[in-house]
Amino acid sequence: MDVIGDLSMDNYIFQYYQKIQDGSISVGKWIGLLFSYIVKGLEEKEFTFNQKKANNAISWIEEHCFHVEGVLAPGNLKLELWQKALISVMFGICDNDTGNRRFREVVLVVARKNGKSLLASAIANYIFQVDGGFGCRVYNVAPKLEQADIIYNNTWAMIQLDPEYIQKKESVSEERKHTHNKVDADETLVKKRMSDLFIPATNSTMKKSVQTQKNLMDSILH
């Protein structure tokens, strides 16, 4: 079933919540309140959980996203339970009537050197290539360009490491040797242009942008 009414242990949200409740995982006050709210909302059917949407995001990220630096590079990204629970909330919690995602904005606060840029890059990559739909626009915004570059460059590095991308690119190159016509498969390849990443087939782009600290805070708070 796509929509799961009961909360089973196959649900990463519930797994994480149970570990918070039994004390095997320690979290801050607001994380505890958040997952209590989510679980209560599911139990009372205030919104629904779409297991397929949640699992699609998790599976795609673990298959197509990679460590791009350090000793784990270039290995596949293996999500921890809290990351799976977060992604399940983002993509799997849906409105009862429309079936659309319930949450349009997510604020994630993670301490330095705990992989927040890596996770953000993986989520951005999934939205850019899969979930965003036709004409998707993904913006990496920071007070300084070098900060905005981090997720943007991570995403491009992940794309280049993806065996599916490599195979498709090789296939396009081989086909071009035998024809002067347009190669259809080339339209589905991610292109790195001067100012963005671009997928012709879906007219999707990923860009980086600079905003002042004040504008960033305004966009978060409002």
Question: Language-model segments: which ranges?
Answer:
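Phosphate/NTP-binding elements of NTP-utilizing enzymes
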Residues: 2-222
